[in-house]
Amino acid sequence: ELPGVLGELDYPADLLWAGRSLHHLGDQRAALAAFAGRLAPGGTLAIMEGGLPSRFLPRDLGFGRPGLEARLDALEAEWFARMRAELPGSVGEVEDWPTLLSGAGLTHARTRSFLLDLPAPASDRARAYVAGTLARVREVHGDELDAEDRATLDRLLDADDKASVHHRPDVFVLAAHSVHTAVRTG
């Protein structure tokens, strides 16, 4: 678990990778500085943070109010802001990762976003991923949803319902993940 585990690793490191983890640390700038301090000269820090919300469904499902995923995104954004604010040692930070990496004494090398595009009809594996993701959203945000959106989400998750993500022919996975790299010079 970060940041304590950093002391248990062998240093200096030629490569450190942090995937979707820094946003769970109260002081992201301090965490990046700790990573930078453990890199060998010429070593690279790669972080996966940012990107775009994933999409799985058409805007209009044929039941419920159109735009469910946009409303779920808004709930997720509110949850994320609360989660960040409640972290021990939380420091508000503009999530400009190249600038944060430079501020940690690293030279920003590159940012690249990777697109995951699994068009409809989705494979069983993709459907399982979609169902798992929506089930997590239902568990975390179920009480915040209005009755219609909760019923829509429940129907999408009901494997016995032909309109669920387990059976719909229009389920897809579209996601973008950003990776930022920086190098320790000197």
Role assignments for model-derived ranges:
Residues 23-25:
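A short His-aromatic
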Residues 47-122:
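Conserved catalytic/acceptor-binding region of the Class I
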Residues 1-3:
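Conserved acidic residues
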Residues 5-16:
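A short acidic, Gly/Pro-enriched loop at the edge of an enzyme's catalytic core
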Residues 18-21:
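A short beta-strand submotif of the Rossmann-like class I SAM-dependent methyltransferase core
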Residues 90-96, 100-186:
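Conserved Class I S-adenosyl-L-methionine
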Residues 29-44:
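A short glycine-rich, Lys/Arg-flanked "PGG" loop and its adjoining helix->strand segment in the class I
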Residues 12, 41, 105-107:
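Short loop/turn motifs at secondary-structure junctions
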